[in-house]
Amino acid sequence: MADIAQKIKATGEDFEERIVEIRRTTKVTKGGKNLSFRVLAVVGNRNGKVGVGVGKAREVPDAIRKALSAARRNVFKVPIHNGTIPHEIVGRQDAAKVLLKPASPGTGIISNGTVRAVVELAGIHNILTKSSGSTNPVVLAQATVNGLKNLLSLEKIAELRDITPQEVIHGVKKEG
């Protein structure tokens, strides 16, 4: 684990950390109940990089440390255009679905707490979201991550359509 911390420090990235959920879990055995804790953490630099992680341990501080370490290992890049996402997308994970829609400047982040934590730390300022299905915070966070990972940048969209990025933003005028 020291290697991960050294890699993060070596890159010079300064990630903001947020604990989304701390849940006490119980395993019942013939010897009694075993208590442990599950923590959902999000890290991001508010500039297009975000990661989500889950940690489990018998003590809360250990679970938090494990969750933050897992989140730092899972950091990925999010394409952002004018403070929002380039296009609409649906993220799915198990029984949860999260619809992510770009919003005009000044809209803010319209979402529930779990999705808000992920998109805020990614650096998105204007977005509309709608979650349906499961309300489990871990599954919602993973569905949001799946949606953000499947976003295409404006350059990639332009390349696929064989037009310039400016034409993607402003639309292409039809000839004829």
Swiss-Prot record:
InterPro entries named in the record: Ribosomal_Su5_D2-typ_SF, Ribosomal_uS5, Ribosomal_uS5_bac-type, Ribosomal_uS5_C, Ribosomal_uS5_N, Ribosomal_uS5_N_CS, Ribsml_uS5_D2-typ_fold_subgr
GO molecular function annotation: rRNA binding; structural constituent of ribosome
The organism's place on the tree of life at top rank: Bacteria
GO cellular component, as recorded: small ribosomal subunit
Statement: the UniProt record of this protein carries the keyword Mitochondrion: no
Domain annotation S5 DRBM: ranges: 15-78
Family that this chain belongs to: Belongs to the universal ribosomal protein uS5 family.
Domain notes: The N-terminal domain interacts with the head of the 30S subunit; the C-terminal domain interacts with the body and contacts protein S4. The interaction surface between S4 and S5 is involved in control of translational fidelity.
Quaternary state and interactors: Part of the 30S ribosomal subunit. Contacts proteins S4 and S8.
Protein's name according to its UniProt entry: Small ribosomal subunit protein uS5
Organism annotation: Thermosipho melanesiensis (strain DSM 12029 / CIP 104789 / BI429)
